[in-house]
Amino acid sequence: MTAKTPLHTTHLACGAKMVDFHGWDMPLHYGSQLNEHHAVRNDAGMFDVSHMTIVDILGAGGRQFLRKLLTNDVDQITHNGKALYSCMCNEHGGIIDDLIVYQRASDNYRVVLNSATRQNDVAWIRAKSEGFAVGLQERRELSMLAVQGPNAIAKTLSILAPAHVDAVSTLTSFECVDVDHWFFARTGYTGEDGLEIIVPNEFVTQLWNDLLNAGVTPCGLGARDTLRLEAGMLLYGQDMDETTTPLESGLAWTVKWEPEDRGFIGMGALASQKQQGIKRKMVGLTLLDKGIMRHGQKVIIEGCPDGIITSGSYSPTLQQSIALARVPVETGEQVLVDIRGKLIPAKVGKPRFIKQGKPV
């Protein structure tokens, strides 16, 4: 039986086409994935992301624990209300999950994890927390909305209480604030400006309806996927997993090597890989002919082992097919993609196609 978010009946009332997403009954779209995509790029859209896993790490040992758990270093967070993106790796350097950690207070950190990896992630974090002065609290009583797009913040501010407006209007990128049991973060998964809002379950339907009345477009998983792909944002379980490392996934920037005595989990394995040199890298592909690149398709590189498409789709913004691919480091400027037995040329570039709504 699939799980349902508190907004399930609201989605149905909005005309959503529902699909099973890792055990959750979630909206794929509300009639037009294309219109939803463009709404986020040009105006404002909202996503129910209440299926995500929210874990609060409480106690005086929170920072010390997270410095051991994550590849990125939370010591970069210099004050309360800051957020940090990181990978969480196993001892072999394989990515268990990617996540955002928010410092709400010196003894209070919030981690938002992927839903598909919830059970494994929570068990891993709990096991690794032994010996640290921390307690873990999974917050299933909370719901989460992502409001994204160039007009997302303005439209959100128009429906908030004055106390919320005062706090939210001063947020900059990767900052967060708590107000009256509501949590606001200027983060997202679309490549656009916006907010992720976490509220008690009993408030989320009213929040959704208020945003709807303010002209924010409901958006489903389909648009969320094409938006994040255009922005070069990876999807766990598809673009990376425990068999891949941050260094070969375009996420080397999330690995902080100094100070050496931090000894985060997987540091030794990643240091060895760095010293030896990676054999594979993540690139962006733009198809040069008709066709759609999809996950799992082969990438043919002359004189090299095959690469593979990890994520691919049609880009509504660029109006052509784009993809993320893991390929040998020797890969040049052009490759061939095997699409249903036909070899179609594709241009190789950076694994990001759109920045703030504009082609990179």
Swiss-Prot record:
Protein name per UniProt: Aminomethyltransferase
Which keywords belong to this entry?
Aminotransferase, Transferase
> What cellular component terms from Gene Ontology apply here?
cytosol; glycine cleavage complex
Query: Which domain of life does the protein's organism represent?
Result: Bacteria
SS bond list: none
The enzyme class is transferase
Entry EC no(s) = 2.1.2.10
* Gene coding for it: gcvT
Alphabetized HAMAP family for the sequence: GcvT
Q: Which catalysed reactions does the entry list for this protein?
A: N(6)-[(R)-S(8)-aminomethyldihydrolipoyl]-L-lysyl-[protein] + (6S)-5,6,7,8-tetrahydrofolate = N(6)-[(R)-dihydrolipoyl]-L-lysyl-[protein] + (6R)-5,10-methylene-5,6,7,8-tetrahydrofolate + NH4(+)
Lineage, highest ranks first: Bacteria, Pseudomonadati, Pseudomonadota, Gammaproteobacteria, Legionellales
